[in-house]
Each structure stands twice: as C-alpha cells, then as structure tokens.
Amino acid sequence: MKFLIMGCGRIGATVATSLWEEGHQVTVLDVDPDNFFRLPSDMRDEQGVTLVGDGTVSEDMIRAGIHGADVFVAVDLRDSRNALAAQKAKHIFQVSRVVCRIGDPTRQKMYEELGLVAVSPTDATSQMILGAVHSS
C-alpha cells in the first residue's frame, strides 16, 4: 500500500518507520527537514521517502503523491493543521482512508462525522494508564 504521512515528529516517524519496514511505500511530508533525522538513515536515503513541504498546501500534497495514496495520515502537533490536511485528503483528493491525530479528544466525534478516523494520543494514553492501574 501507498502511505502519505504529514508530520515527522515522534509519532509520525514511528508510524512511517513501521510501515516502511513492513514493505509499504511511504512518503513523509514535513515543513522542517531536520525532523527527517528521526527516521532510520537507510529509509531517509531512499528516493521519494522524505519531502519538505506543507501538508496543508494542495501543491505540496500533489508533489508528495496524494493522488496515488491509499492512506493519508495527519500527525502534525496542531489539531487545526491535521484537520485541514485530512479534510483535503478525504474530500478533495478522494483518499479512501484518512487518519487524523487530534490532541483534544473532545473533538473526536466532530472529525469522525467528517468521515475521518480520529485518533487521540491523550485518550489512548489515558486508557493504557487506567488499564495498568486496574490490572495491578
């Protein structure tokens, strides 16, 4: 499968690396080229894996291969950027599977009503901690 990931922070880099190691075609789009150092060197060296650009800008999304993407993942630190990029991927570029990171779990239902898969690290971490507390 072909994945386009916007954001190469800790979450984006981890997701991108895992998918790449599974043999998927992965392109990571980030405004800061220094963030690509979170990726393994052999992954960074592969042609077309990293691209400096803004995932909310249509031209940069096109350069990154949005038209051929099976999945778009928005994992920027800012919810507003993730929401904008994810909506463009889903509704303008017709990407079938769009996953959007949201820091504020109260917005999750709204994003899901827009047809996006919304993932909240805050919610996920809280659930893991509660699970650990209750299993003690």
Task: Give the role of each language-model region.
Residues M1-S136:
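Cytosolic regulatory regions of ion transport systems
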